[in-house]
Regions:
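Short N-terminal targeting/anchoring amphipathic segment
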Residues: 4-7, 71-92, 107-109, 266-269
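Conserved donor-binding/catalytic core segment of Leloir-type glycosyltransferases
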Residues: 178-195, 201-204, 217-220
Length: 317
């Protein structure tokens, strides 16, 4: 079976690499990705023709459009049995493209990492709904997302496949001894308001000085002002947390990310909402205990708190 896997966010999307590593023994896999993204993966064909970013606005639009034209040509001429879409760089253009080209592929599959953008407008809801209805199969990672799709878009249950998020096999957790002087906590991922970094900082501010002297928290990840304009550095200073919080903004390379997880005693997820979290599975892959808010996705993915400590959402205490 010929499968075309479309992924805009390689090489950062370890999930897609792991999926293709598993599928390649049974299927003929081609990954359509952005320029410079291919990684050594025996048995997988790469086509890096999508826009990789980093140009001026006019040239960026031309290169982005050129990448979509190349993708359309691949779908129309590649004779693929399955077109598997992992995500969108700009759904406004890509969803109509997939809907129009569906007749050129056997089965259209989409992994629903996020049911909707976190700041979804009514137009977004209609756009994503159109795409979900056109797809032949939707893959979700928990029952919570399956039910949301059925409730929001009235999709039949047989169209939605619940496949638990796999662990990251490239990770080799080292034997770890808990820190005796200060317990190390880590919150990793792109900074967004729904991830509750402000809740975490307020919780630390409510601790006594003696309690804070025994902990150290690292908040690491990229921050895009259009998605979250909060000045977390100022918030840390305002709450007097400079001595126990390290804010590490920007892209975290693989080696540095590995060091962050290896060093952590616990991983933190004080989220307000989420459809599913790859970062939570990353923590599990490193054999790290997790502290997470008791929102539906985390309730399910921690087996009701059996594999993680849960606390009420938006509750610093």
């Amino acid at each position: 079976m010929k499968v075309l896997m479309v992924e805009h966010f390689l090489p950062g999307s370890v999930y897609t690499l792991e999926l293709c590593r598993a599928l390649r023994t049974e299927e003929q896999i081609t990954i359509f990705c952005r320029k410079g993204a291919p990684r050594p993966l025996e048995g997988v064909q790469w086509k890096d023709k999508l826009y990789a970013g980093g140009k001026g606005r006019a040239e960026a639009l031309m290169r982005y459009g050129g990448g979509l034209l190349a993708l359309a040509a691949e779908i129309c001429t590649g004779h693929y049995d399955v077109l598997h879409v992992q995500g969108f760089k700009d759904a406004r253009y890509e969803i109509p493209l997939y809907c129009k080209l569906k007749r050129h592929c056997g089965i259209l599959v989409h992994t629903v990492h996020n049911l909707l953008p976190h700041e979804a407008s009514p137009r977004d809801r209609r756009l994503y709904g159109d795409f979900y209805r056109v797809c032949d199969l939707l893959v979700v990672h928990n029952l919570y997302c399956r039910q949301l799709l059925m409730d929001e878009y009235h999709l039949p249950p047989e169209k939605i496949c619940v496949t638990p998020h796999g662990s990251y096999t490239q990770i080799s957790p080292k034997e770890h001894q808990l820190h005796t002087e200060k317990t190390e906590f880590l919150q990793f991922g792109v900074l967004r308001r729904y991830k509750g970094v402000d809740i975490l900082l307020e919780a630390l501010a409510r601790m006594t000085e003696t309690q804070r002297s025994r902990v150290h928290v690292t908040v690491a990840g990229q921050q895009f002002p259009k998605l979250d304009a909060t000045d977390y550095a100022a918030l840390i200073r305002e709450k007097g947390l400079e001595g126990c919080v390290t804010l590490q903004l920007g892209h975290v390379p693989d080696e540095a990310l590995d060091a962050l997880y290896q060093e952590a005693d616990f991983c933190l997820f004080p989220y307000r909402e989420i459809y599913g979290s790859g970062a939570l599975l990353m923590a599990y892959s490193y054999s790290k205990p997790v502290l997470a808010s008791s929102i539906p996705a985390f309730e399910e993915e921690t087996d009701g708190g059996c594999t993680g400590l849960l606390f009420p959402p938006e509750e610093p205490d």
